[in-house]
C-alpha cells in the first residue's frame, strides 16, 4: 500500500520548484547548491530530499512542468479548430503570457537543459520539438508553398527567436506590457511572412555554392 502524502505536500513542492527556479535563473544551475535551495525555501536539507531526490531531478521537474504548460496551450488552441492565422496569433499571445508568468522557469529551460541527465534531457527536447512542430504545422497550412520550399522550419524558429528571448531584455511596464507585445510580435511575423518568396532557398543555395558550400541550414 502506497504511503499517503501529508496535507500540503503539493503546495510545498510547488513552492520549492518556484524558489529553485528563481535561484537557478539568478545564479545558474551549476552555481546553486541544494543547501541554498533549502535555505531559500525555509526547510532543512533532509526535508528537501523528501520532495526531490537530487538537484538534477529538481531541474528536470522545473523544465518539464514549464513545458507541460506550453504543450497545454498548443492542445487548447488546436482544439478550437481555428484557421492558421488566428491560431498562430492565439498561440503567440498565450506563449507570451506564459513566459511573463514564468520568466525564471523559462530562463532555466533555455539555459540549463545541458545539465540534465540524458533521459531527462531527451524528454525535455522532445517536448520542445512537439511545440515547434505544432506551430510549424500551422505556418505550413497558411503557406504550403513555403513548406515545399523547405522554409517553414526556419521561419518558425525565427518566430520563436522573437518570443523565447524576451525575458533577457523586455521589462513589462505601465506603457508597454507583455499583453501589448504579443500582437506586435504577431504583426511583425505575419508582415514578414507575406514578403517571403518561395524561391529564397534557391538564392541561398546558389550563394553557398559560390563560397564552397560552407553555409549550413538550421539543422546542420
Region spans (language model):
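Hydrophobic alpha-helical connector segments
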Residues: 61, 75-101, 155-159
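Alpha-helical DNA-contacting segments of helix-turn-helix folds
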Residues: 60-66
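Short secondary-structure transition hinges
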Residues: 90, 96-136, 145-150, 168-170
